[in-house]
Regions:
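Intrinsic-disorder-linked linear interaction elements in eukaryotic regulatory proteins
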Residues: 1-222
């Protein structure tokens, strides 16, 4: 059904908004609007890719299909395959001169796959580049920049670089609370990451542990 709807929208020049709405049928239920996950998401991603693989590399729909395939592979723990798809997608985007925003999105997915594969240093390096890229593109108050900071600090904590993680989070959390609000999911995740970066540090002081507990208590209330 998604294949037919997208093709119809393109053929009749119904516009980007309509195409995007119909494209969503590939990855989300039209009734409840929840995203497909696991083997269902993977199966639809694979079907989507087979449907659109014959299009030129510069075709937007082909690029979306490739991203959907990579996400499906990653979610079902076919990590090496996901890595190959995402790396190929990034190479294509750079070759065809895609927008910086599009490239940063693919780099975010690739960094996540690096992390899942246990390549933490590579994940950190790419997340640092993504965070820097979003800051230049949108500024520190944009949601993409805040989410990139969250990913970056998660890798810093995983690599036991607690002081660096806390320093970035101390700068980022006030911005997130002001822009997104205290109840927003990304704000809560940033604060949780800060609490973790405090209490898992072997060098944590009593004041650090107290601040961590207080932060977690505040999050729980919210």
């Amino acid at each position: 059904q998604a294949k037919i709807l997208v093709a119809e929208a393109e053929e009749n020049n119904l516009g980007e908004k309509v195409i995007n709405e119909r494209w969503a049928r590939w990855y989300a239920c039209s009734l409840c609007e929840q995203r497909y996950h696991g083997v269902v998401g993977f199966a639809l991603g694979w079907a989507c890719w087979k449907t659109h693989v014959g299009r030129p590399e510069t075709d937007q729909v082909r690029g979306l299909a490739m991203r959907l395939l990579g996400s499906g592979l990653s979610e079902t723990d076919h990590l090496e395959d996901a890595f190959s798809v995402q790396e190929a997608e990034l190479s294509i985007l750079r070759r065809i001169g895609a927008s910086e925003h599009h490239i940063l999105g693919v780099q975010t997915n690739l960094a996540s796959t690096y992390y899942k594969l246990g390549h933490l240093e590579k994940a950190l390096s790419m997340e640092r580049d993504v965070y820097s890229g979003y800051l230049k593109l949108h500024g520190k108050e944009h949601e993409d920049s805040l989410r990139a900071a969250l990913n970056y600090t998660s890798s810093l904590v995983a690599l036991k670089r607690f002081e660096e993680a806390r320093a970035l989070l101390r700068k980022t959390i006030p911005v997130a609370r002001q822009v997104l609000g205290d109840n927003y999911e990304d704000t809560l995740k940033l604060r949780w990451s800060f609490a973790v970066a405090l209490y898992v540090d072997p060098a944590a002081t009593l004041d650090d542990l107290r601040e961590s507990v207080e932060t977690l208590a505040e999050i729980e209330v919210i």
